[in-house]
């Protein structure tokens, strides 16, 4: 009774400063009132009126949660909802979906929350990180940038990315590598999804002026929890390649299969690895592969440190080019 009275009083007292009051009760009995921004990778972000910085709360430490905010909600099963949520008297969570009505789920089934309204801005997200290195030997200078912006809807997600690396040193040609693209995912029941990608690569090391790659496939998340996710995708791609020098341009069809693993239940550190293989359909014996390994350490104020490794391999490169190229980068970034 005392806790209920205190809880009600706290919600009333903060109502003057928040257009929408959300609240939760932790397993240790503490009560936090504020505005839920999102929950991703097992961490809930809360904006409060009594702190200059947002609170980060481990999802597994929450006992009860109450909110009338409109959320995009994803369960570990891949089921998606759109609406507010509140804890029930039985210890589960009731989601009031705007389409299907009330659904009762376990709290630990929820793996993603994002507070949204009917505006475009609330569904956007972005990040950018920059790196710069100087080495006295050979007067090496290297500048790198990695960036991404995306939009999340109820049943689909779209992203655009752009990455650039430029390196110079004495007695050798400058090295430039630019890559990026557009990607789209349509989410199906039970954590299946349809990926559509259009990517580009320009790489002086492999004598690639421009490689365009259009992909269509089918994927599934086999693990999707507050500790990690692991997915696999297969499909087909069309490749158009323009090379430096006298090498002829190429157009080819490829199959592809790839996997992605993200681990994030390790404090402020997260690890992301992706591997994709492209066996050619129209060029006998040719196959390509892309590999990405990123580690990210979260800092205050939405800043982060990132350490990344990227590898591109082609077993049939054009004459005069190497069969592989890799990038090792470090940078300071900001996420929004």
Predicted features, each with a name:
Residues 127-129, 144-146, 177-181, 193, ...:
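Membrane-embedded beta-strand positions in outer-membrane beta-barrel channels/transporters
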Residues 150-154, 185-187, 219-223, 260-264, ...:
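Structural signature of outer-membrane beta-barrel channels/translocons
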Residues 154-160, 191-194, 226-230, 262-271, ...:
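Repeated loop/turn-to-beta-strand initiation elements of outer-membrane beta-barrel proteins
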Residues 132-136, 153, 164-168, 200-204, ...:
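Transmembrane beta-strands of outer-membrane beta-barrel pores
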Residues 324-336:
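Outer-membrane beta-barrel "beta-signal"
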Residues 19-163, 179:
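Compositionally biased alpha-helical segments
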Residues 128-134, 147, 160-164, 180-182, ...:
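Transmembrane beta-barrel strands of outer-membrane/channel proteins
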